[in-house]
Amino acid sequence: MRDVAIIGYGQTKFGELWEDSFRDLIVEAGVKAIKDANVDGGDIDAMYIGNMSGGLFVGQEHIASLIADHAGLNPVPCTRVEAACASGSLALRSAVLSVASGHHDVVLAGGVEKMTDVEDATAAIASASDQEWEAFFGATFPSLYAMMARRYMYQYGLTIEELSMWSVIAHENATKNKYAQFGFKTTLEQVMNASPVADPLTLMHCSPVSDGASALIVCDADKAEEFAPKDEIIYIKASTQASDTIALHDREDMTTLNAAKVASEKAYKLAKIAPEKIDVAEVHDCFAINGLILVEDLGFCKKGDAGKVIDEGKIRIDYDDFVTVNPSGGLKAAGHALGATGIRQVGELYWQLKQDKECKDRQATIKNGYGIAANVGGTGGTVCVHLLSDKR
């Protein structure tokens, strides 16, 4: 298997982008990535695009053909990848495997979602849950994650203040990200006193409905220096995936994402490092409780200790003796354009590890040169992990 490198990244702003169409968004992100990578359209061997539900959100299926056409890249093969909110990272994983296998040399991995054109986005998103045993009975993702939060609070003594601090830190980081949907600060009191959604979660514990797109250019590591300076090349040391039950009630423990534990353990093994070597992480905080759970499941602290870690501010950008988590603002504040999220997470790590000017105001301390991203589909039925390094 060949080593795989990232040589370019581009994204749109995330938010309610009324004037931009579905096709406008992915073309903008793709063009930015191609320019950043210093490649031509003719260099692209294939494209993999993550999209959860173009059919429900904008009435458009067969998006692979649409994107190749509107990007001006026909007849380059383009494949749409779907795994709920993990669609983007699985598109990247497909791209990584195609390059590592030697089948392709230069590949575009992208993600896109246009969520604000549908009347009831919550119902559309619920299609990623178990339709017979969850959605049929009225369960939505806010209610499912609320059950996870309530159980975690009961089992480990997590306080509402500790849970809410996650959102406070996320918004603080997002003020330094020009692409973020919610680039404003908030307070503990504002988070706790926001409109209730599903007890114990308020609106400010939840990620928003977002439009947006993101794209990465990956290539054979031996070819990377043909396009990018050596100090601007970031290497994908591991791309792993694991599955779990789609329905929350079938899990042995709803306070952990077993697929995240399995996928991250595989990633650490492939990269031959321990969790302590990670400098920066982007985790899937679709709801604040999931951020805390992933901090534990990725091995950054013991089970039940995440609340204390968050309350002490250890995940903050300016805290040197712990992994920096979600410097972008995460899904909570940067936005969650479903199919684009997994790519955006890895794009943030790409910027962070090469200490790019794009993240100069939110730059994490890079000591060991490693970053990890965990992208979750549903309530953890699918998890994809990417581990990056600034060293080959």
UniProtKB/Swiss-Prot annotation:
Its EC number is 2.3.1.9. CoA binds at residues 206-207, 209, 332. GO terms for molecular function: acetyl-CoA C-acetyltransferase activity. Keywords: Acyltransferase, Isoprene biosynthesis, Transferase. The keyword Acyltransferase applies. GO terms for biological process: isoprenoid biosynthetic process. Pathway: Metabolic intermediate biosynthesis; (R)-mevalonate biosynthesis; (R)-mevalonate from acetyl-CoA: step 1/3. It catalyses: 2 acetyl-CoA = acetoacetyl-CoA + CoA. The active site is at residues 85, 336. It is an enzyme of class 2 (transferase). Belongs to the thiolase-like superfamily. Thiolase family. Catalyzes the condensation of two acetyl-coA molecules into acetoacetyl-CoA. Functions in the mevalonate (MVA) pathway leading to isopentenyl diphosphate (IPP), a key precursor for the biosynthesis of isoprenoid compounds that are building blocks of archaeal membrane lipids. Interacts with HMG-CoA synthase (HMGCS) that catalyzes the second step in the pathway and with a DUF35 protein. The acetoacetyl-CoA thiolase/HMG-CoA synthase complex channels the intermediate via a fused CoA-binding site, which allows for efficient coupling of the endergonic thiolase reaction with the exergonic HMGCS reaction. This is Acetyl-CoA acetyltransferase.
